[in-house]
């Protein structure tokens, strides 16, 4: 299965190169057709509850100098990817940016430019960057709980790991590639997943043994979650019907972490169905919690208030719950961290707060 994925990716890239060659062979100015990935071509699919690319297409042509440079960079990148697949190597996105220093006129001016080109190739081919042997700098999440996975290590050996019994307090680190050829989910002994924004709160729940008392899988998101984290959660939800609850701070940016997990992000709209878990439930801090528990707070910044107002028209936050909580947060002009619950002691979050919220959802 692994080789088939990589062979398919190579064929897709070779088809692009052949098309450019054939255009040049006929004396035409070469061009590529690519999906438009601007905000105007991204729609929220109410049917699937995820962000999706629209049908608008654009052209990258050598007619202008900048377009010619981008086509040259594209060809260099495709060659680099093919070489990695042949050599059974992989590269970080950062390494690929520096590799381009040897491409003379085709070198990238910024890493953002090289990252976007890799995303364009994903959108054009329907392949994933994992199929291209490209990986991000950041690690995936830490997880702890009663699930058993089988991971293929760098030597090609299969290793079975129980993510509760075979790991230390820091948990199991999710690799950048969590597809079935790399990672198999062998057994699931948890009732639900709880995705936690901050490391401090993840450690609190681990120390309090919440994974065992609630029979859950704890996942540390590390802020905005990495793609591998979202994909890992999606696989558990889709393949094993494990519900997802998201526990974050109470501010507009944390609300967007929930939205990214549940409905996808605009930037990766072309793969939202592959990453998003639309059935996710929110159990994070709300404006109502701030008032009901009299939590320590900070004042909203102008940026916070602007982001909250934008969320009122964001289709990911439709429904009375989000409308009420966002409007209330704007009204009280306050935000709070999830660790503010420590006001009531170190056990309050696991003895009272989460059991109450999860109980309302029928998860505990």
Q: What residues fall within each predicted segment?
A:
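Nucleic-acid enzyme cleavage-core boundary/entry regions
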Residues: 1-243, 252-364
């Amino acid at each position: 299965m692994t080789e088939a994925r990589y062979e398919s990716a190579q064929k897709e890239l070779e088809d692009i190169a052949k098309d450019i060659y054939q255009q040049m062979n006929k004396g035409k100015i070469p061009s590529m057709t690519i999906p438009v990935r601007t905000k105007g071509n991204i729609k929220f699919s109410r049917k699937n509850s995820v962000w999706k690319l629209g049908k608008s297409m654009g052209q990258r042509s050598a007619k202008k100098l900048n377009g010619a440079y981008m086509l040259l960079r594209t060809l260099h990148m495709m060659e680099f990817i093919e070489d990695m697949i042949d050599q059974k190597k992989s590269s970080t996105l950062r390494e690929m940016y520096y590799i381009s220093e040897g491409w003379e006129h085709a070198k990238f001016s910024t890493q953002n430019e090289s990252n976007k080109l890799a995303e364009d190739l994903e959108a054009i081919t329907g392949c994933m960057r994992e199929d291209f042997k490209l990986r991000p700098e950041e690690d995936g999440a830490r997880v702890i709980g009663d699930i058993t996975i089988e991971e293929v290590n760098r030597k090609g050996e299969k290793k079975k790991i129980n993510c509760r019994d075979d790991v230390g307090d820091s948990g199991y680190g999710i690799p950048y590639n969590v597809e079935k050829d790399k990672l198999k989910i062998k057994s699931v002994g948890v009732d639900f997943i709880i995705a936690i924004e901050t490391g401090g709160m993840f450690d609190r729940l681990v120390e309090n043994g919440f994974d065992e008392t609630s029979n859950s899988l704890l996942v540390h998101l590390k802020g905005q979650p990495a793609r591998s984290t979202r994909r890992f959660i999606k696989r558990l939800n889709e393949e094993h019907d494990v519900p997802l609850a998201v526990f974050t701070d109470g501010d507009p940016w944390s609300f967007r972490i929930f939205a990214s997990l549940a409905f996808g992000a605009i930037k990766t709209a072309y793969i939202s169905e592959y990453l998003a878990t639309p059935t996710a439930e929110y159990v994070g801090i709300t404006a109502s919690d701030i008032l009901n528990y009299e939590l320590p707070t900070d004042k909203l910044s102008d940026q916070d208030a602007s982001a909250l107002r934008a969320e009122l028209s964001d289709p990911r936050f439709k429904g009375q719950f989000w409308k009420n909580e966002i409007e209330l947060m704007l009204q009280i002009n306050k935000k709070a961290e999830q660790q503010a619950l420590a006001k009531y002691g170190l056990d309050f979050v696991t003895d009272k707060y989460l059991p109450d919220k999860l109980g309302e959802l029928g998860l505990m």
